[in-house]
């Protein structure tokens, strides 16, 4: 490893996960099994990917951990919050993502991961009915905490966890359900002082519970990662808090299945200068995520995230002949996304894509993609990579929006107030990721294709 200014990964790394469902328990179980040598963390860039550093005779292909000081899997300590009280072993068994034989070897460790009461507002996830939630006594009745009380309780949770587990650093990862759509409000979400005032005024319309988690994490010196499409940290006020606390933030929405394919396949259409008339995407999903997304207000949040991918790759304003033909009100290609709750499939999501393209002299063609995937199996390595790389970013003194983590995310954060455009092209994202790691490792950035 070259001389680098990145602080070493000394001591334990606490990973506090919001949610103890299918994704979280698959992530935790996989890490615990991998460090016992009983499973391989396939799909994890930090554990498998190699990149070239140097050129010509000096070129070498190195793992990320040979370039920058990443935390070891052996140093990870897990904790979580959830609205359901079942420990991580019980939750993993309930989720039925992994076989019992792949859970039992780490049963004892999983049983020790007991969810702390969640900061929860049922209005933001109506399909969830757990009672392991933070509340207070008022007039002999239990009531939901105010938003500021949520923040203070969560901050205490983070401090207590860090002290009890002897962690030198903590990362907070949202792997819980999608909340209802919260439009960005300039009067509340643009200035940190306004956001704090709204929290203290218990503004439940504009302050989602996830914002309380993010505020608490950043205030306690922990990077925050948004794995759902929630508005949460995608607001200027949170960017200001991240700048103030000098903490990294990353989001939003894990790029696992259909959007991963879309961000990788759309550039093929674009680089070949083929035209696009329409792209229809539909999914069936039966886990708790699918249940929550069956609620229209929650699906709207996901829809906005999934629809944002194509428009920055296949641009109607740049190539009107190719991408300005469609039948929607914006006179561009037709793009629709649907998710259908189908319990028999559980976590085994299936996605269908119908892509109507046209070529020479406008003659039409079609592409069909059918992806039968396992949602949590694809999400788990993203959780690991995002946590390790966010921790790395913090030790490297990188704070605010971590654009180099866009590779892992469906709707990458960007400063839309300044007209910045998100990068959704998978291959461009991969280049940005590799160059950020090269730079943190003391190597020159490199635009050449490996």
Mark where each language-model region is.
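Metallocofactor- and cofactor-centric catalytic cores in central/energy metabolism, strongly enriched
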Residues: 1-138, 142-228, 232-244, 260-264, ...
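Short flexible/disordered coil segments
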Residues: 230-245, 284-295, 312-321, 342-349, ...
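Glycine-rich, aromatic-lined ligand/substrate-binding cores of catalytic
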Residues: 305-312, 316-401
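Glycine-rich beta-alpha junction loops
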Residues: 22, 83-85, 256-257, 280-286, ...
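Conserved anion/nucleotide-ligand pocket segment
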Residues: 250-252, 256-327
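Short glycine/serine/threonine/alanine-rich loop segments
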Residues: 221-222, 247, 273-274
């Amino acid at each position: 490893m070259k001389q680098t200014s990145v602080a070493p990964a000394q001591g334990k790394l606490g990973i506090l996960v919001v949610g103890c469902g299918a994704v979280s328990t698959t992530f935790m179980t996989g890490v615990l099994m991998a460090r016992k040598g009983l499973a391989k963390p396939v799909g994890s860039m930090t554990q498998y990917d190699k990149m070239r550093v140097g050129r010509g005779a000096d070129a070498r292909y190195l793992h990320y951990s040979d370039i920058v000081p990443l935390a070891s899997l052996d140093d990870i300590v897990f904790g979580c919050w959830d609205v359901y009280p079942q420990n991580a072993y019980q939750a993993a068994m309930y989720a039925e993502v992994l076989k019992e034989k792949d859970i039992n070897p780490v049963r004892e460790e999983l049983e020790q991961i007991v969810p702390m009461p969640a900061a929860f507002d049922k209005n933001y996830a109506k399909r969830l009915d757990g009672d392991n939630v933070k509340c207070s006594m008022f007039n002999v009745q239990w009531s939901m905490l105010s938003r500021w009380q949520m923040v203070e309780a969560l901050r205490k949770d983070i401090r207590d966890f860090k002290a009890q587990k002897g962690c030198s650093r903590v990362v907070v990862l949202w792997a819980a359900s999608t909340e209802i759509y919260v439009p960005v409000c300039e009067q509340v979400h643009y200035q940190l002082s306004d956001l704090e005032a709204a929290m203290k005024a218990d503004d439940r319309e504009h302050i989602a519970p996830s914002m309380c988690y993010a505020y608490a994490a950043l205030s306690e010196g922990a990077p925050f990662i948004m794995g759902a499409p929630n508005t949460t940290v995608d607001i200027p006020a949170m960017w200001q808090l991240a700048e103030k606390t000098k903490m990294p933030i990353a989001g939003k929405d894990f790029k696992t299945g259909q959007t991963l394919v879309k961000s990788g396949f759309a550039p093929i259409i674009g680089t070949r200068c083929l035209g696009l008339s329409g792209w229809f995407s539909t999914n069936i999903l039966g886990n708790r995520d699918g249940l929550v997304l069956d609620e229209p207000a929650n699906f709207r949040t996901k829809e906005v995230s999934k629809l944002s991918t194509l428009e920055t790759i296949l641009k109607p304003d740049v190539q009107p002949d190719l991408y300005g033909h469609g039948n929607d009100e914006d006179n561009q290609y037709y793009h629709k996304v649907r998710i259908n709750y189908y319990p028999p499939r559980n976590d085994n999501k299936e996605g269908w894509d119908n892509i109507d393209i046209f070529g020479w002299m406008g003659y039409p063609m079609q592409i069909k993609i059918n992806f039968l995937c396992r949602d949590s199996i694809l999400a788990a390595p993203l959780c690991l990579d995002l946590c390790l790389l966010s921790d790395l970013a913090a030790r490297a003194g990188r704070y605010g929006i971590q654009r180099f983590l866009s590779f892992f995310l469906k709707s990458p954060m960007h400063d839309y107030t300044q007209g910045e455009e998100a990068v959704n092209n998978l291959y461009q994202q991969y280049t940005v990721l590799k160059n950020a790691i090269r730079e943190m490792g003391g190597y020159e950035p490199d635009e050449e294709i490996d």
